[in-house]
Amino acid sequence: MRPLPSLALLFVVLLLTGCGGSRPSGSTNTRSASKSRRSAVHAKARASVKVTNASPQPSWRRYTGGVPILVYHDLGNPPPGQDYPGLYVSDADFEAEMAWLHQQGYQAVTLNEMMDDFFHAGTLPAKPIVITFDNGYVPQATFAPAVMSKYGWPGVLNEITVDHLNNNRLKRLVSLGWEVDSHSLTHPDLTQVSAAELQQQLVQSRRFLQRVLHVPVNSFCYPSSRYDTAVVAAVKAAGYTNAVTEHPGFATPHTDPYLLPRFEIEGGLGELQADLAS
């Protein structure tokens, strides 16, 4: 694994500047090249967003079935030379998928709401689903909420905090009813780092989000879904109440809360339909 710069230094830079480091996939130059082609679409989307009230509704009841958790990475079309083009879902596909979910009676909730139902006598809608986004790319904070707000839905952003979205974008997501959780400081393979670095990746990323957003940060997202017993134990010790993987399946009250499954969406509507029918 490529050695990381000093995490202590990285965290100081994070606190002072609010950005730094590099994304886990694709180059900065490649992403910059695609920015102009997508800016007009996402600017229009931003203008249409309405504030969402994501709190439980009177019609919600205790729910004991399986809850699907989806995970999206980047939205839009992959630019030429992108290292991981399969992680992109086009804007049209994303809109079609959200429309289909709504037509099927699904209602998006946050991980906090799901966990409250599972373990604290909370409530959920009749057909709940959790829609998560990993890493913290700009379209996840602009285009995705514009589409999801049509249905009054919140999302969940798992943020890499050293190379994070600017604070105003994160705060705006929270104002829309979104949940923002930790995806580590720098997205390393946590099974390959020292115990000290593991603790920094977990604790400092959580503290940063809590300090900036003034909200609970209860969930952790394992970078690249890499974990072992030591990593899971460290996640618990850092104060998280649950963690998400990229293993497919439905979350239930009987699922290990630190190994919550998610369906990774990398294609069109047919893939989503097949996942939810499994």
Regions found by a protein language model. Give the residues of each.
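Bacterial N-terminal signal peptides that target proteins for export
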Residues: M1-A8
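Long, low-complexity, Ser/Pro/Thr- and often acidic/Gln-rich intrinsically disordered regions
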Residues: V12, S25-G26
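Bacterial signal peptide processing site
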Residues: G20-S22
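C-terminal active-site subregion of NodB/CE4 polysaccharide deacetylases
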Residues: R31-T132, Y137-Q140, N168-K171, S175, ...
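Acidic (Asp/Glu)-rich catalytic clusters
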Residues: P145-Y151, H164-S182, K236
